[in-house]
Amino acid sequence: MKLLLLCLGLILVCAQQEENSDVAIRNFDISKISGEWYSIFLASDVKEKIEENGSMRVFVDVIRALDNSSLYAEYQTKVNGECTEFPMVFDKTEEDGVYSLNYDGYNVFRISEFENDEHIILYLVNFDKDRPFQLFEFYAREPDVSPEIKEEFVKIVQKRGIVKENIIDLTKIDRCFQLRGNGVAQA
């Protein structure tokens, strides 16, 4: 277990150093996270995890900071073609800005600001029983973002080893908006 945590720490430190080299990416101020978010992109080095019926094909609705520094989030996903909701709690780790979660394996992730505090990227490393994989989730405060911001995200994840075929633009699919409490219609 100690070896796993050491490897994980090294992965996240390297990812953070890479992020710091990009002008567009910064550590996110967690005090600003509470509220509605929309899933814009999913990207992974294991595409089947984010394809239709993949375990990581989830759509964010709300994220809230909890008093104990953990995060609470509500997500939607499709199960047998039906939209369903489920909550998650992300536990704060000892490393600043890093959270963990048991979901389809053990996950550790960092939240980074992208362009401004209206856009965030979750960089997640999953240690499942089969093999580890990385996942990038791009969230925004609005249901869609400009083509320029989308292009920037694609460049960022490609620099981190994700091939274009493993990047899914979620704005072009049903993201289960009908379950959201705000009445947003799917485009």
UniProtKB/Swiss-Prot annotation:
Disulfide bonds join C83-C176. It holds the Pfam family Lipocalin. One of its GO terms (cellular component) is extracellular space. Glycans are attached at N53, N68. Expressed in liver and in sublingual and submaxillary salivary glands. Highly concentrated in secretory fluid such as saliva and urine as well as in hair dandruff extract. Gene3D superfamilies: 2.40.128.20. It is found in: Secreted. PROSITE patterns: LIPOCALIN. Its main location: secreted. Keywords: Allergen, Disulfide bond, Glycoprotein, Secreted, Signal, Transport. CDD domains: lipocalin_MUP-like. SUPFAM superfamilies: Lipocalins (SSF50814). Several N-terminal ends may be due to cleavage by signal peptidase at different sites or may be generated by proteolytic processing of the secreted protein. Analysis of the sugar composition shows the presence of GalNAc, Gal, NeuAc, GlcNAc, and Man. May be also O-glycosylated. InterPro entries: Calycin (IPR012674), Lipocalin (IPR002345), Lipocalin_CS (IPR022272), Lipocln_cytosolic_FA-bd_dom (IPR000566), Maj_urinary (IPR002971). GO terms for molecular function: odorant binding; small molecule binding. Residues 1-15 form the signal peptide. Belongs to the calycin superfamily. Lipocalin family. Homodimer. This is Major allergen Equ c 1. It comes from Equus caballus.
